[in-house]
């Protein structure tokens, strides 16, 4: 029996021995082939898989050229993967993506930049929500601004941003508002502007209050609902009385959030949510 085991072991070693270096080379070849796959689903899968490697393993060398892919879903996957690294070395590529001609890619890049605490991210999102001013950064032309505002946000891109709701530390008995955010974003006619406002709802940017105040009377119901949500969760108690007219809003989703926000703000002076530090969520 012992001899048989030794023979079997020898056979296994003879036919199954593979050097680690050879396996690594094979893996790199597989990723390279996937990155250049003729099928966009294959390239998208490669971009997603690259979120599992490290930057020092040439991830950026793979991902950089993919930002020029002709398929939008591939470019969005690249931006998402760049965000997974949470590393400042990805910033040049993310800022390139911020200038993509397709609004969905721009928004995905802005979201990641905001999470990395890069000022260009929050500025871009504020401009999506607010009105064009002389101080606007010029990130996009009037045509792109119009396209961004007309965009109905793909739920899969933004549905989870309420989880960052928005940087609140747990407070017993105080709701995060996650369900409220998801409800707004999952509506088929919810806009990218509403998603952008929810995303920056925890920002300490000094212009956010003005943006929220203006959004309370926006023509799009999802933006009004998002503004009410941010008034409650940020919070902005100074807008409490401005909520009263929205109790008669023509959209039920706005009315019920307004009622809840008004009640919540009644005790906001007594219970203030503790905020986390500057860590990325």
Predicted segment positions?
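Amphipathic alpha-helical scaffolding segments comprising HEAT/armadillo-like alpha-solenoid repeats
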Residues: 21-34, 54-68, 87-99, 118-131, ...
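Sec-dependent N-terminal signal peptides
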Residues: 3-12
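Residue-level detector of extended alpha-helical repeat arrays and alpha-solenoid scaffolds
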Residues: 43, 75, 106, 137-138, ...
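Core register positions within helices of long alpha-helical scaffolds
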Residues: 49-52, 81-84, 112-115, 199-202, ...
């Amino acid at each position: 029996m012992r001899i048989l085991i030794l023979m079997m072991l020898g056979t296994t070693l003879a036919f199954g021995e593979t050097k680690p270096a050879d396996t690594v080379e094979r893996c790199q070849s597989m990723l390279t082939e996937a990155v250049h796959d003729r099928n966009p689903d294959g390239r998208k899968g490669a971009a997603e898989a690259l979120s599992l490697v490290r930057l020092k393993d040439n991830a950026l060398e793979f991902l950089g050229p993919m930002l020029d892919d002709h398929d939008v879903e591939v470019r969005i996957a690249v931006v998402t993967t760049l965000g997974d690294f949470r590393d400042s070395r990805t910033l040049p590529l993310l800022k390139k993506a911020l200038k993509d001609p397709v609004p969905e890619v721009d928004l995905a890049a802005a979201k990641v930049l905001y999470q990395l605490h890069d000022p260009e991210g929050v500025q871009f999102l504020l401009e999506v929500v607010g009105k064009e001013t002389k101080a606007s950064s010029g990130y996009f032309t009037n045509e792109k601004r119009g396209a961004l505002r007309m965009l109905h946000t793909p739920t899969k891109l933004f549905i989870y941003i309420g989880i960052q709701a928005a940087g609140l530390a747990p407070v017993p008995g105080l709701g995060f508002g996650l369900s409220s955010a998801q409800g707004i974003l999952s509506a088929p006619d919810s806009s990218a502007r509403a998603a952008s406002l929810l995303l920056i709802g925890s920002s300490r940017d000094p212009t956010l209050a003005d943006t929220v105040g203006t959004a309370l009377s926006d023509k799009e119901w999802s933006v009004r609902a998002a503004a009410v949500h941010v008034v409650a969760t940020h919070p902005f108690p100074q807008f409490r009385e401005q909520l009263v007219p929205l109790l008669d809003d023509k959209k039920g989703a706005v009315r019920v959030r307004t009622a809840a926000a008004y009640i919540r703000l009644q005790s906001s002076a007594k219970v203030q949510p503790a905020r986390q530090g500057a860590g990325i969520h």
